UniProtKB/Swiss-Prot annotation:
The keyword Coiled coil does not apply. The gene is traI. Belongs to the autoinducer synthase family. GO terms for biological process: quorum sensing; signal transduction. GO terms for molecular function: N-acyl homoserine lactone synthase activity. It is an enzyme of class 2 (transferase). This is Probable acyl-homoserine-lactone synthase. Keywords: Autoinducer synthesis, Conjugation, Plasmid, Quorum sensing, S-adenosyl-L-methionine, Transferase. Required for the synthesis of OHHL (N-(3-oxooctanoyl)-L-homoserine lactone), an autoinducer molecule which binds to TraR and thus acts in the control of conjugal transfer.
Length: 208
């Protein structure tokens, strides 16, 4: 399994990986979680996909997308600020140039991959490491996101606790919470699985 960061696809292979990631989002958010999201032709997307985000993809050895997340600069339009302001205690996001938003995080939990820390899926840890690696490589120090309480517990369990920036509130069928996560080299080194590989150019002594 390796991590890729794709903004604009440079070739047919990257274009296919992006399509596969939209298909994964449809399976997870629409089919499994039952969210009211826009699915066309088996692919989930929204208006934030039109803002030239960077997609972090975890790709298996057989070129299957097994995890994904979407990253956008927090100073621009974001889901947390524009869709979920009710989750912010101040009513607005105190964004800065070193903050990036992570949204549409999901992992194909049906894959028969090994598990990492305890019962945490290896693909989940790989995605955490990939998001941090890309953020540090691009001089972001803080990641803002909206998640649910179950996933907040997973973050705490692996030693990457969410710093809440508002109280949890019901959003649809779940209880959501907004918060920030530090993007730090030592966190990356601690979370990455032993067989972690990526194509992100970073400062961690590897060619990503």
């Amino acid at each position: 399994m390796q991590i890729l960061a794709i903004s604009k696809p440079r070739n047919i292979e990257e274009a296919q990986l992006l399509r596969s990631h939209h298909e994964l989002r449809a399976r997870v958010f629409s089919d499994r979680l039952g969210w009211e999201v826009n699915v066309v032709g088996g692919c989930e997307s929204d208006t934030f996909d039109d803002l030239q985000p960077t997609y972090i993809l975890a790709v298996s050895s057989n070129d299957r997308v097994v995890g994904c997340a979407r990253l956008l600069p927090a100073l621009g339009p974001t889901m947390v600020a524009n869709v979920f302001p009710s989750l912010l205690s101040a009513g607005h996001l105190n964004a800065h140039s070193s903050m990036v938003e992570s949204s549409r995080f999901c992992v194909d939990t049906f894959l028969a991959e090994s598990r990492g820390d305890g019962s945490i899926h290896e693909a989940t840890l790989t995605m955490f490491a990939g998001i941090i690696e890309w953020s540090v490589a691009n001089r972001y120090t803080e990641i803002v996101t909206v998640t649910d309480l179950r996933f907040e517990r997973i973050l705490a369990r692996v030693g990457w606790p969410l710093q809440r920036i508002g109280e949890p509130r019901p959003i649809g069928a779940t209880v959501a919470v907004a918060g920030t996560l530090p993007a730090k080299a030592d966190t990356f080194m601690r979370l990455r699985p032993a067989n972690y590989r990526s194509q992100i150019i970073s400062t961690f002594g590897q060619s990503a």
